[in-house]
């Protein structure tokens, strides 16, 4: 009999928690829907934000919106201290999301512009890198042994890097052959043709 009584006593608290959760989700959903139309005006603003002048005004604008939400929240869980604590962290998140959403949208727009610029640079890069490759100067890429495919490494590497790549490939090939010999029951017998095929794959 005590268990049903405890459940009945906890039922209002559970209902309040559920109501708070639903309200928080609706606020987040509304905040996610509202920045989409507002994303067009902030796009011209990022160059102005680079100066730093408008940046403080934007985070301050949603804060007054937090004060109307503040009195509503404490009124609901006033009698429940435990539920008030989760509502407290949830409360700043609701108003914080509208402030964070435009900022995140602006950051994403800036990142997208940077990626587009890099793509444009990448498209222009190969045409300008052609003469540099012939001279052997100015062309650079991040070298990581064993990661290049086909004959890429022959065209792009210095002599030292080419030797390192071939050394790594030989180590990989030796590991493959050892694995195949150690696991004959899994892979079967290795013929000379198999060895030649592997050597051809590694261009050796």
UniProtKB/Swiss-Prot annotation:
Disulfide bonds: none annotated. Residues 63-103 have a biased composition (Low complexity). It is a single-pass membrane protein. The keyword Ribosomal protein does not apply. The modification Phosphoserine is found at residue 191. InterPro entries: Mxra7. Residues 110-126 have a biased composition (Basic and acidic residues). Keywords: Membrane, Phosphoprotein, Transmembrane, Transmembrane helix. It is found in: Membrane. The keyword Zinc does not apply. Residues 32-148 are annotated as: Disordered. One of its GO terms (cellular component) is endoplasmic reticulum. Pfam families: MXRA7_helical (PF25473). Residues 38-47 have a biased composition (Pro residues). This is Matrix-remodeling-associated protein 7. The lineage of its organism: Eukaryota, Metazoa, Chordata, Craniata, Vertebrata. The gene is MXRA7.
């Amino acid at each position: 009999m005590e268990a049903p009584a405890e459940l009945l006593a906890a039922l209002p608290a559970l209902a309040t928690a559920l109501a708070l959760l639903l309200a928080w989700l609706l606020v987040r959903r509304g905040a996610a829907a509202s920045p989409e139309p507002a994303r067009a005006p902030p796009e011209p603003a990022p160059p102005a934000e680079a100066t730093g002048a408008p940046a403080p005004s934007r985070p301050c604008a949603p804060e007054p919106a937090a004060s109307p939400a503040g009195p509503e929240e404490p009124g609901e869980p006033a009698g429940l201290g435990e539920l008030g604590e989760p509502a407290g962290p949830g409360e700043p998140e609701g108003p914080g999301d509208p402030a964070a959403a435009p900022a995140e949208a602006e950051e994403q727009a800036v990142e997208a512009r940077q990626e587009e610029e890099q793509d444009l640079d990448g498209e222009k890069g190969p045409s300008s890198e052609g003469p540099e490759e012939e001279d052997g100067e100015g062309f650079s890429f991040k070298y990581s042994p064993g990661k290049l495919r086909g004959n890429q490494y022959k065209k792009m590497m210095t002599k030292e890097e080419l030797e390192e790549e071939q050394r790594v490939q030989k180590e990989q090939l030796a590991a493959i052959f050892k694995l195949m010999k150690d696991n004959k029951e899994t892979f079967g017998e290795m013929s000379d043709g198999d060895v030649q095929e592997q050597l051809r794959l590694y261009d050796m």
